[in-house]
Amino acid sequence: MPVIKVRENEPFDVALRRFKRSCEKAGILAEVRRREFYEKPTTERKRAKASAVKRHAKKLARENARRTRLY
């Protein structure tokens, strides 16, 4: 859990913004959304594999686009 110390004479809005930013960096909301419903291990592996394939395809597309523009 991210912890922030409220500085002297610091407005509440600024402290809240810093807390939200630290929660976002820690990935707490993404973790909560991921754990909201139970996901079977096979489904979890399938989703992870699909995202890896998508990442790889995106990387290849970027590299191919870079090569075609440099002629």
Swiss-Prot record:
Q: Where is the composition biased (Basic residues)?
A: 46-59
Comp. bias (Basic and acidic residues): 60-71
Query: Which GO MF terms does the UniProt record name?
Result: structural constituent of ribosome
- Give me the ranges of the annotated region Disordered: 43-71
Q: Which UniProt keywords apply?
A: Ribonucleoprotein, Ribosomal protein
Recorded protein name is Small ribosomal subunit protein bS21
Pfam families assigned to the protein according to its UniProt record, in alphabetical order = Ribosomal_S21
A GO-annotated cellular component: ribosome
HAMAP family per UniProt: Ribosomal_bS21
PROSITE patterns (UniProt xref)? RIBOSOMAL_S21
Q: Does the keyword Protease apply?
A: no
**Which Gene3D superfamilies does the UniProt record give?**
Ribosomal protein S8 (1.20.5.1150)
Q: Which domain of life is it from?
A: Bacteria
- GO terms for biological process? translation
Against PANTHER family, the record matches this protein to:
MITOCHONDRIAL 28S RIBOSOMAL PROTEIN S21 (PTHR21109), SMALL RIBOSOMAL SUBUNIT PROTEIN BS21 (PTHR21109:SF22)
Give the family this protein belongs to, as stated in its UniProt record.
Belongs to the bacterial ribosomal protein bS21 family.
